[in-house]
Amino acid sequence: MQESVMQRMWDSAHLSGGNAAYVEELYELYLHDPNAVPEEWRTYFQKLPVSGGAAADVSHSTIRDHFVLLAKNQRRAQPASAGSVSSEHEKKQVEVLRLIQAYRMRGHQVAQLDPLGLQQRPAPADLAINNYALTDADLDTVFRTGDLAMGKDQATLREIHQALQETYCRTIGAEFTHIVDSDQRNWFLQRLESVRGRPSFSPEIKSHLLERLTAAEGLEKYLGTKYPGTKRFGLEGGESLIPLLDEIIQRSGSYGTKEIVIGMAHRGRLNVLVNTFGKNPRDLFDEFEGKKVEGLSSGDVKYHQGFSSNVMTPGGEIHLAMAFNPSHLEIVSPVVEGSVRARQDRRCDAVGDKVLPVTIHGDAAVAGQGVVMETFQMSQTRAYRTGGTIRIVINNQVGFTTNKQEDARSTEYATDVAKMIQAPIFHVNADDPEAVLFVTQLAVDYRMQFKRDIVIDLICYRRRGHNEADEPSGTQPLMYQKIAKQRTTRELYADSLTQSNVLDNERVQAKVDEYRAALDNGLHVVKSLVKEPNKELFVDWRPYLGHTWTARYDTRFELKALQELSSKMLAVPEGFVVQRQVSKILEDRQKMGAGALAINWGYAETLAYATLLFEGHPVRISGQDVGRGTFSHRHAALHNQKDGSTYIPLQHLYEGQPRFDLYDSFLSEEAVLAFEYGYATTMPNALVVWEAQFGDFANGAQVVIDQFITSGEHKWGRLCGLTMLLPHGYEGQGPEHSSARLERYLQLCAEHNIQVCVPTTPAQVYHMLRRQAIRPLRKPLVALTPKSLLRHKLATSTLEDLTQGSFLTVIPEVDQIDPSKVERVVMCSGKVYYDLLDKRRNEGREYIAIVRLEQLYPFPEDDLAEVLAPYQNIKNIVWCQEEPMNQGAWYCSQHHMRRVAVAHKKELFLQYAGREASAAPAVGYASMHAEQQEKLLQDAFTV
């Protein structure tokens, strides 16, 4: 509907003639310094229409100055006689433009970035005037400034050179010319050059800066005095991080951001928790004194703890979340990205305006850890993008004891890895708080406008050792001689403010005293902290607390509704041409839905997702080749053979259904699994699935499995319902395509921390997946899924199995065998069951019963005992596995099996049938594989 005339008048009332002078004055100010006008006016001016090909707008005062300059140079502008003078001038003009570009590209190499002054880098020849056929005689010659945003079209070479040095060679080193997109490059040119890299801040802002620095320094001094020698991984030397984070929060709040998730390592973490998040200092002191936190099992050290709070900003209340993390550096970054994506999905924030990720790195780790590259690589992909991350490097120029650049990295800067995604990088001297503030404003504005990553390289130093008990001068003698004489950032900035009459010494000291008094009294020290936060910003986890793995659940689904869902799931849009083989799969699934064909694995799995969506559970699946499935069994994404378009039927079941996200991941295990862990810990109602291409490759993410998935609840109380599907099975494909390393997961099992399942029928995987979402328990599920069973003639189920059944932790003997005649029970898991069944039937050994353990942890002792109960005459009980003896379930689960066997019949001794112990999971020769397989099957019946 067209807006009314009155509405248009109201909307443009601020532009009426009476306000023209004010608006023009604001615009004049904007042209000189875009940072100097309020955010809403800056946004308005940025959206003003520009004629095609027109140059950037110029302020009126600049035009007036230009005419004065023309008058002064009128005589010079007239050539004496020949065109050679003009030609020579034009050649020099080209050189001037080259000089401008050189400063933009390489000015950062001579910027004053190191607070200690230890960096001695030779100035690039590109920045010397005489490198461009220019001499000192040209310094007062007037040249066109090109696109140099210095406020005028022409200036002397001296003025141009001075502007370039002030913009690019002071305490900010800007790297953005590697960005391909010209709009982004021009945006930085305008923002930097218009203020020569140093905007003027109001006295109020400067006072607030000092207050934040006082807080950062004050906490470290207080802890150092009260708990001397105790590890805290202090921020001393990098105190500018606190005003930096404060500006990110307040400025992003003015954009309408509702949540910020921060991931960081140990350095400065306690300072951030108290001075940014508003953690009560008294609680921190309790942790220093070793008091146990109620409700946690093992707990973790204080500098790994997460936290959340709400603070007030100009745009309203913001929820802050600090991610829990281990000491494994950089691995928390993709976890943060996953948590942010879940929050964005929950808010239907597809653009990334409402939730902002911030990750804080160390210089040594950001340059050295491979997961950093993986996390950057995922930043613009459909599956993992979050609208851009502000990445901060606390660059204290030393990694524990390593500070020689030739040892620490092969790149010029620790941040060079970010250039792979064309992220702008701003190196800034941490002893210049106003430069830090300006760079932070640029970072927030850039991220909000372009929705891409940006890096702030906060170059500082580490006043003490790696931790407070470490003496660093033994390995960095010269650096620590310099640090011993270095005044703190707060002291330097306080002197600057008193000398410029912004504050007097009494007010400076008052800030110090006020902060110390707050700590002494155990008071919150974040003034913007919201004492009664808006609970709508939280997720209610209460329904998922206090449950055991035996909690009741119902995964049945009414037949008629199931068939209706099946029809919708198999519907293809008119004119959508699928591949011939895929068409046959869909036809077969139609028959399965009608009960005319036995149900296979792919159909049962996708039906599980459809029913969960119907019941209100979002579903997210990612991993390599998950749309089709590595083994062509899933086909949840259909591809049009005519135009290449993709159709995902599970996204079109009914109007207003929950999200169904299906993403083929880029080729990463570590970052992707960490991302999905972060997502699952933030979206408890969803079924979040990561599938490995082969289970063998999951160990590329072993850090995520060890430090988060299996231990996160025990250490931090973090619930997680992530499901891992790991294709596993010995089919003669060699040592790298046979084993998901089941033994690794079982070895990590304790205190009911995870679930390990090995489903062998379509109905089992259907109920297993539904159980994971429907049951209120939120524990990670590790499922070893099959490969050859996907199309095995015996590995099928019926519609009744899906509509009436449930997940069976133990499946009893399926053939009609007289229990009283059974002398041997063979227990097994996975694909080997069908090999055993086939052999038993062929050989007619009806005195042998075969029992499947479908859940290996938590071990279902009661269910197994119930299945064994009818067999009162057994003489032998055997565990059979395809894996070598030192792998698989044997070592980690035999004590559970033995306990049940002995309870059933005291004289029973559990025997082993399987491959001999091996350093590799499997052999590489088909003939040897077949020989081993036949032997273990024979052993199962005779050992």
Feature-to-residue mapping (PLM):
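Flexible, glycine-rich loop/tail regions that form catalytic "lids" or insertion modules at the edges
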Residues: 94-101, 108-143, 230, 452-454, ...
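Active-site cores of enzymes that catalyze phosphoryl transfer or operate on phosphate-rich substrates
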Residues: 197-219, 285-337, 341-348, 649, ...
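Phosphate/oxyanion-binding active-site loops and adjacent basic polyanion-contact surfaces
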Residues: 234-245, 324-336, 368, 432-436, ...
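Active-site pocket-lining segments that scaffold enzyme catalytic pockets across diverse folds
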Residues: 223-282, 590, 599-618
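Extended, charge-enriched "interface" segments that sit outside catalytic cores
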Residues: 48-241, 257
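Conserved phosphate-handling catalytic cores of large alpha/beta enzymes
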Residues: 401-410, 419-455, 459-465
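Cofactor-binding active-site loop characterized by glycine-rich and histidine/acidic residues
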Residues: 258-422, 426, 631-683
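Subset of Sec-pathway N-terminal targeting signals
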Residues: 2, 7-48, 54
